[in-house]
Amino acid sequence: MAFVPPQAGYDRAITVFSPDGRLFQVNYAREAVKRGATAVGVKCNEGVVLAVEKRITSRLIEPESYEKIFQIDDHIAAASSGIIADARVLVNRARLEAQIHRLTYGEPAPLAVIVKKICDLKQMHTQYGGVRPFGAALLMAGVNEKPELYETDPSGAYFAWKAVAIGSGRNTAMAIFEEKYKDDMSLEEAIKLAIFALAKTMEKPSAENIEVAIITVKDKKFRKLSREEIEKYLNEVMKEVEEEEVKEKEEDYSELDSHY
């Protein structure tokens, strides 16, 4: 008879807690997100920004076909990390809920309502047999009365953020946000911060493998930045990084001079 580890029963069944209160399949779904491409979101007074790493593994892939930021409604967008197919199901459900709300009430859906609907669906997939948790997390951004930014977890939990990152580069990006985020930053500064944080998590950042979208308070419309716009912001950000590195080196040398 083969040896069966003590936790195997809790490991296989989505509806059974382990003795220490964990649902292993939910934890594994989170691991799928941690291994996914990095996605970041930044909120400011003028709007909200989403930026995502596009992991293009072959030069034969058409970059435009590799979509990681999705329009949910005119005023709502989502960026994904984790299993893309799972994210697509969640995005389609969010689009459906947004249109149902618009047809029922004659007004754009509040972002918080859509986020709750999606997280209710995620939570259901942690509670019933015959299903598995969604191996994807979404950053959901939008503008109703004001800019809003939410992170949705595979467990069904959701949180509102000023700036947040998901995916493999989460720790690096969050450290940058903790240091550089300002409540009074402009939309352009928010775009630069999002691209800077994302670029720091990538080996070779370029306009081709970065996707950026914005929703402004002024028009409440979703818009993706063109490759030329992304390249302009990326060049400005990388130039600032190089200047900072040179300044740090000069400071280091000045400290050495004090020993003579």
Curated annotation (Swiss-Prot):
Component of the proteasome core, a large protease complex with broad specificity involved in protein degradation. GO terms for molecular function: threonine-type endopeptidase activity. Keywords: Cytoplasm, Proteasome. Belongs to the peptidase T1A family. InterPro entries: Ntn_hydrolases_N, Proteasome_alpha, Proteasome_alpha-type, Proteasome_asu_arc, Proteasome_asu_N, Proteasome_sua/b. PROSITE patterns: PROTEASOME_ALPHA_1, PROTEASOME_ALPHA_2. It is found in: Cytoplasm. This is Proteasome subunit alpha. The formation of the proteasomal ATPase PAN-20S proteasome complex, via the docking of the C-termini of PAN into the intersubunit pockets in the alpha-rings, triggers opening of the gate for substrate entry. Interconversion between the open-gate and close-gate conformations leads to a dynamic regulation of the 20S proteasome proteolysis activity. Its main location: cytoplasm. The 20S proteasome core is composed of 14 alpha and 14 beta subunits that assemble into four stacked heptameric rings, resulting in a barrel-shaped structure. The two inner rings, each composed of seven catalytic beta subunits, are sandwiched by two outer rings, each composed of seven alpha subunits. The catalytic chamber with the active sites is on the inside of the barrel. Has a gated structure, the ends of the cylinder being occluded by the N-termini of the alpha-subunits. Is capped at one or both ends by the proteasome regulatory ATPase, PAN. One of its GO terms (cellular component) is cytoplasm. It comes from Pyrococcus horikoshii (strain ATCC 700860 / DSM 12428 / JCM 9974 / NBRC 100139 / OT-3).
